[in-house]
Amino acid sequence: MGASGRICTVVPVEDAGEAAMLALSSPTGCVELRLDFYPGDPGEALELLATRLHSPARVVVTLRSAGHGGLDRRARGERRAVLARLEDLAPEGWLVDYEVEDLHASSGCSGCIASSHPTTPPTPRRALEEAAVAERLGASAYKLVYPGVEPWEQAAAARLVAEAGGFATSFTLGPGTLASRLTALALGAPLVFGSHPRAPLDGVPQSSEIMELYLRMGLGES
């Protein structure tokens, strides 16, 4: 898959209609629908979005919890039911993001993304073990993101991507986040994430900038 399909443009879903327009204007071939921004029933928003989005080709559906840096404050038990419903409602080929706690509490998933957002990086061995468990539980990709200022923290993220053979993505948050995302992309990560130019998020580089710099590196076509 080209870089455009591996760079997901984040779309905060505050209003389903506006989110659909943002998604359709994504500068990359992948969008992430952040349903934790939605004030109502996330399933209702997803149903509406599913009828309107015939492009981009790749869509990630996310209900990020407050414990992982998002806005959703449902208890894990309630989240499990909501995520299962989102997976049922999602069109074929769309990926639902399961935080690792949700995935472990469920009976697995069908091609989801297993994500983890710790405050400190796990050891590379622990990260690889967690990725392996996620794969056994049905995930098609593993995502590990954490704050990182020191060079070794960014190197640890890159090592996971390199050793996971296209199954894992990992990058750091903070001053070096753009370089960390580019490194993950260059090493074959299945996904990295950037903000929409019309809906910027604090601390998240724009997906169009990630794409531009990746192509400038001369590593491949979009």
UniProtKB/Swiss-Prot annotation:
The keyword Lyase applies. It is an enzyme of class 4 (lyase). Keywords: Amino-acid biosynthesis, Aromatic amino acid biosynthesis, Lyase, Schiff base. Pathway: Metabolic intermediate biosynthesis; chorismate biosynthesis; chorismate from D-erythrose 4-phosphate and phosphoenolpyruvate: step 3/7. It catalyses: 3-dehydroquinate = 3-dehydroshikimate + H2O. SUPFAM superfamilies: Aldolase. The active site is at 117 (proton donor/acceptor), 143 (schiff-base intermediate with substrate). GO terms for biological process: amino acid biosynthetic process; aromatic amino acid family biosynthetic process; chorismate biosynthetic process. 3-dehydroquinate binds at residues 32-34, 64, 181. Coiled coil: none annotated. Belongs to the type-I 3-dehydroquinase family. Involved in the third step of the chorismate pathway, which leads to the biosynthesis of aromatic amino acids. Catalyzes the cis-dehydration of 3-dehydroquinate (DHQ) and introduces the first double bond of the aromatic ring to yield 3-dehydroshikimate. This is 3-dehydroquinate dehydratase. It comes from Aeropyrum pernix (strain ATCC 700893 / DSM 11879 / JCM 9820 / NBRC 100138 / K1). The gene is aroD.
